[in-house]
Each structure stands twice: as structure tokens, then as C-alpha cells.
């Protein structure tokens, strides 16, 4: 099992990840959102391209 040698190393890695602004953004305009009908149901068609 992997064990960390020091908590300072963990804190440094957490700070590095917290400062990463290039990761997932919830305000992504290209992200597809499912539209729901009045009953709260949604559907999607998945097409596999060759």
C-alpha cells in the first residue's frame, strides 16, 4: 500500500491541485445538458460514428 512520507508533501500536492484552473469547469459552454419534459423525464439518442 502507498504511504506518504510526510504531511507537508500532501499539503503541497493539495495546494497544487487547488490552484489548477485548467481542470473541469461547470460553466463549459460546449457541455450538453439534458432537457426534461413536464413530467421530469429526459431522453437522448446516442449515435456511434464510424
From Swiss-Prot:
InterPro entries: NA-bd_OB-fold, Phage_T4_Gp32_ssDNA-bd_sf. It comes from the Viruses. Signal peptide: none annotated. Keywords: DNA damage, DNA recombination, DNA repair, DNA replication, DNA-binding, Metal-binding, Zinc, Zinc-finger. GO terms for molecular function: DNA binding; zinc ion binding. One of its GO terms (biological process) is DNA repair. Binds preferentially to single-stranded DNA and therefore, destabilizes double-stranded DNA. It is involved in DNA replication, repair and recombination. Binds ss-DNA as the replication fork advances and stimulates the replisome processivity and accuracy. Homodimer in the absence of DNA, monomer when binding DNA. Interacts with the polymerase and the uvsX and uvsY proteins. This is Single-stranded DNA-binding protein. It comes from Enterobacteria phage RB27 (Bacteriophage RB27). The gene is 32.
Amino acid at each position: 500500500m502507498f504511504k506518504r512520507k510526510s504531511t507537508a508533501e500532501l499539503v503541497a500536492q493539495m495546494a497544487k491541485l487547488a490552484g489548477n484552473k485548467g481542470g473541469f469547469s461547470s460553466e463549459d459552454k460546449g457541455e450538453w445538458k439534458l432537457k426534461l419534459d413536464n413530467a421530469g423525464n429526459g431522453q437522448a439518442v446516442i449515435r456511434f460514428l464510424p
